[in-house]
């Protein structure tokens, strides 16, 4: 019924145009009518009148004839639409079909070559979302060796058309593109967890604007340092640990000088918070520190959080302290102490100038330090949203693009699906790079479909994971095809017959998805037909000669703060604001 109404509305001008000739015929026939005429004599008279069609006469019968003709005309239209069936010839079992790469590129590519996002060799999308009303959130799926870095990540970085935060396994992209960024006037920062001696510094304390940010950071820290697959039926331990960490962090934020606000100091405070199982009344140096603060400020938020922790008995409190210390064990490493003691990242300036931050992580199973990158991303989102909403009252002046290579290796903040749905209005875009759909399901058990749904571009580069093949096949949909069946019987009265019918078929079956040519990629853009195109040839990039892939020297990073032995002998015992710990030890 809805289709019929839509069809009538679209054809209404045509039906209305025929009203004039209908009235003309009625007037012409009314002029031929005389009382006592049979239908045959009337038709003969009407036939003669048509030889002089503009000889019209108004008679007493003219209004009646006009009414009858219009009534018959309306009845004919009604009969036409009520007799229609809801048919879609050729689409009975599905309407999926392949689109044209050329037409899509013409629709989505910006005339300014530097203001696009590269999808494939012949398909690019403008960074101006108002032009095509699509967001610039992308999901890239491809197995090992499918070219996720070479055919998508690198070419887009080489455009140098935004600020970037890049997850860079092995540091491959930094070496290849770092010099190009410097030539383009970028501020370049590196957070290197493979070789911290070549890393710039990142201190989480520098991006805490309000007390609530402390709890967000601790929540991300605990989740990032909890082994995958580990489950606790009792949330008591994590909540108690959160209260302890929050108390220490809030104490440093409100009471300690800036140079002492770092994760190493928190670990030092925990080491001085020992509890005795047999003596619940024992007071550690840390207890005395908070007792002194309570005497001055009884309602201090750090004191209140510490009281929550101290509700645990001696044995339980000791277990909480041990658990908290184990999570912070990485900060006993001198090189980690150095790169987290101060801050060079300037996350808040990413949306105000061209800046690139490369987070270099191991591509092996060693993810022991990756929690630091997770914390950095959590605070980057907070800082970028603050700058967009409070400072610029809307969108950031410089677009910021988050390039999540090996997305599964770094845990993002809780509620990332909500962030993904709101970042576009702030001129923030993200590219999630996965090996298969299973990785996304493991990370976001309840929200994985929403994360894919929020991204208007989906690129599949090939792979060998079965559930991904099935998912891509379902995304592509079904088409309607013609089938032919034949039968033959032999013998004296043998016969042969053929039947033609239609049936539905996947545009690509899971097996065909698996066998996708390694040089091709499948691209799905919201509201468009899927297309297959060649992967981008990095050697044809206009800036290739300025990168390591094009023969230029590799970029070698020198940290802003030179790594010296003196940096490792930080005299924690001389911290003025917490020297009371030493006095009570």
Tell me what each language-model feature is.
Residues 16, 25, 59, 99, ...:
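Short linear interaction motif-like sites in intrinsically disordered regions of transcription factors
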Residues 94-98, 120, 132, 136-137, ...:
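General secondary-structure edge motif
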Residues 1-146, 150-155, 489-490, 583-584:
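Basic- and hydrophobic-enriched, low-structure N-terminal and domain-boundary segments
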Residues 134-428, 443, 503, 511-535, ...:
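P-loop NTPase motor domains
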